[in-house]
Amino acid sequence: MIHLILDSTSGVGADFLALHPNVHCISLTIEMGENYVPESEATIKAVIDYSEATKKSVPTSQPSTGDFLKLFSDIPAEDPIIVLCICSTISGTYNGALLAARQSGRKNITVINTRTTAIGMIHLLEDGLDMIQKGLSYEEIAKALEEASMRTGLTVALDTIDYLKRGGRIGKAAGLIGSILKIKPVIYLNENNEVDALGKVRTTKKANALMIDYLKKQEPLKRLGIVHIENEAGAKVLYDKAKEMYPDMDITLTTATPVLTAYLGPGLTGFIFERAK
């Protein structure tokens, strides 16, 4: 049996895991004061409340090497494993998984930097499960998912730059710091998989237009998802626009996870996509 492992920033649900014994989730950890909470047990509200009360970053930590090794050991040695990790420039999870795979001594583990997160990782998971169902080999599936990860992308509009700034993940979007008040920073992952500034505008309408223009430049698309953090109304606006553009595409609207909230803050809306071949 081929096994697929995702990290908790994917947002994969417990019900889904219960239905798929070959799919596993490994949790990142959120630090709020003296409390270390697995992301799977944390809430978005708790992260926001802590950050707003302290005006500090909410530290997160990747799964430990031991966590990965324990999960690997729970899977039969003869069963191949594909690990799908959050974008490596946002979290060290990918590098940690690579180290654990080497230490395990197993030759049948492939670790993939998905270059995405949230619904983007779920899209890759769904593709992996579909290929397993069709009877493709471990090597074929790993290669296909590696290639698909190179076609992923995202762009999001932030309600605040504070969370990126506090957490030190601002990357090439540093130029947004100190900008005029009440702007809508729009970021994306550039060709080097780094957080970069797409632009800064004053209104949500202009932020949406900027993201839509960027999305059009990525066409043709294979998959598209809408993501938000405590902004379902804003996400619904993007969803409606996306359905107008791609009426035949199955577009998913979903919330991000507590770790992504610690990185990016509340109010976010945006697109996560995979380009067609």
Language model features with spans:
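Mixed-charge interfacial surface used for oligomerization/domain docking
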Residues: 3, 8-34, 73, 80, ...
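Class I S-adenosyl-L-methionine
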Residues: 35-103
